[in-house]
Amino acid sequence: MDLVTLDATQHASYPEYCSLLFQGKASKQLSFEQIANHLGRSEVAVAALFYGHARASQEDVEKLCELLGIPPADLSKRLRGFPDRGKGVDMPPKDPLIYRLYEIVQNYGQAYKAVMNEKFGDGIMSAIAFSTKVDKELDDQGNAWAVITMKGKWLPFTRF
């Protein structure tokens, strides 16, 4: 199994605890899916914790420390703090996969907005009251397809 790791020299803007999490993940040879199952959370939510883009509950911290063999004192206060979301990603992104996601919004953002406005009215899709997941599908020829599902609460603009 190929596992994602973190090269802290290339990602100096991430919080220090990110390296601890990734070191524990690598030493235990665990995927985000396996860690997510242990925490009872989604893979994407767990990956966001590892990059410092999400806040962990005390239960998350305890389970992570137990699973990854990290002393709780090293993580508890830092991982329970308020995250600095969005830090560490250049705009436009340089990583090819992240750039493709950016490109999807560039190419289809107006179309998504138009269809959503017609279906829901004037407003926005929340990225706070939000969930997302990634699935893998194989077509009839055996080609792998990435399926990204995003679900956000609709927030209508208010008149004032």
From Swiss-Prot:
Entry keyword annotation includes Lyase = yes
- What role does it play? Catalyzes the reaction of cyanate with bicarbonate to produce ammonia and carbon dioxide.
Spell out the Pfam families in the cross-references: Cyanate_lyase, HTH_31
Q: What SUPFAM superfamilies has UniProt attached to this entry?
A: Cyanase C-terminal domain (SSF55234), lambda repressor-like DNA-binding domains (SSF47413)
Q: Where is the signal peptide?
A: none
Q: Which organism is it from?
A: Arthroderma otae (strain ATCC MYA-4605 / CBS 113480) (Microsporum canis)
- Its transmembrane ranges are none
Q: What name does the UniProt record give this protein?
A: Cyanate hydratase
Enzyme Commission number(s) of this protein: 4.2.1.104
Q: Which family does it belong to?
A: Belongs to the cyanase family.
